């Protein structure tokens, strides 16, 4: 078995990842002089400041790619990525420490 591998009965058909979750598509540009790689579960709002995009719109979202994968942004590169909303308790800790708890939109 490969770490992260999921074995399923082929007769069940394709598995849809993140079914029913809110997604959004954004344009991202690397204005830095070094490549920036973002992992599958990294809170996109808190990625490297060299990446330019509508940051406020990404609060509570991560890349909509399989677990363990990443997207690499080369210097000067611009690309469109799809994001998916975090699920569960919707509490964010770590990364760059910009949230450290419940997402603002859900605080009462």
Swiss-Prot record:
Induction: By urea. Its EC number is 3.5.1.5. It is an enzyme of class 3 (hydrolase). GO terms for biological process: urea catabolic process. GO terms for cellular component: urease complex. It is found in: Cytoplasm. Pathway: Nitrogen metabolism; urea degradation; CO(2) and NH(3) from urea (urease route): step 1/1. It holds the Pfam family Urease_beta. It comes from the Bacteria. GO terms for molecular function: urease activity. It catalyses: urea + 2 H2O + H(+) = hydrogencarbonate + 2 NH4(+). InterPro entries: Urease_beta-like (IPR002019), Urease_betasu_sf (IPR036461), Urease_subunit (IPR050069). The keyword Cytoplasm applies. Keywords: Cytoplasm, Hydrolase, Virulence. Belongs to the urease beta subunit family. Probable heterotrimer of UreA (gamma), UreB (beta) and UreC (alpha) subunits. Three heterotrimers associate to form the active enzyme. The trimeric urease interacts with an accessory complex composed of UreD, UreF and UreG, which is required for the assembly of the nickel containing metallocenter of UreC. The UreE protein may also play a direct role in nickel transfer to the urease apoprotein. This is Urease subunit beta. It comes from Proteus mirabilis (strain HI4320). The lineage of its organism: Bacteria, Pseudomonadati, Pseudomonadota, Gammaproteobacteria, Enterobacterales. The gene is ureB.
